Amino acid sequence: EKRRAYGLNSGHWNTSVLMILLFIGLYLLRFVIASALGGQLSEFGKIMANPTTWIMFFTVLVNFFLSVAAFFGEEYGWRYYLQPLLQKKFGLKGGVILLGCVWSVWHLPIDFFYYTTPDMGLAALASQFVTCITLGLFMAYAYMKTQNIWVPVIIHFLNNNMAVVFSGTYSADVLQNQQIHWADIPAALVLNLLIFGWVIFMKPFKEKKKENM
């Protein structure tokens, strides 16, 4: 009962696994489309065919158990605590979009001083808004669908680590000092909306109509 009261009671495991697999599939689809648009589809094919890629992928999965505390802490705050509060006040969709904005601002320091350099910081922040809102929609959908906090925890972990694997660098250095330009933002917005944003039309986001008295 205590675990249930604090949102720690896992459940709906079949749906939970499907949500995680769906995320992995969508994440890779985004990689494929981005590679095709950048004329690097053949390079991505080589990465996928490289056994090292899959060794690193399974290594990342094992590392989840060593770094779970950080991701659990974030998601317990974002998805379990803050999301329902914002949804109650701003609606099922509006609350999640607002949460995505808050989540974006949370990343502000690393947008300027880690992911890129200060001169590109504002573009990086705009890109972060695109990512956090669209990915936040999918994570909110997965959580509302399963009522299992471990689903967004695992998705958050995978999102942060799969770029290291499927970029072909196999190093976290790929996340640092990125070149992010304003001209890249519109395409990123469209792509992320197509990959993750469609969930906003699914049943968990449907507002319940109040019955007439």
List each language-model region with its residue ranges.
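Functionally important transmembrane alpha-helices
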Residues: 121-181
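Membrane-interface helix/loop boundary segments of multi-pass membrane proteins
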Residues: 72-100, 114-115, 144-148
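C-terminal membrane module of polytopic membrane proteins
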Residues: 157-213
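Aromatic-anchored segments of alpha-helical transmembrane domains
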Residues: 24-32, 101-110, 157-169
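Residue-level signature of the transmembrane alpha-helical core
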Residues: 20-21, 64, 68, 97-104, ...
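Membrane-helix interface linkers and caps
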Residues: 1-18, 33-51, 70, 196-213
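Hydrophobic cores of alpha-helical transmembrane segments in multi-pass inner/ER membrane proteins
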Residues: 63-71, 134-137, 189-202
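Membrane-interface helix termini and inter-helical loops of multi-pass transporters
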Residues: 37-49, 112-120, 171-179
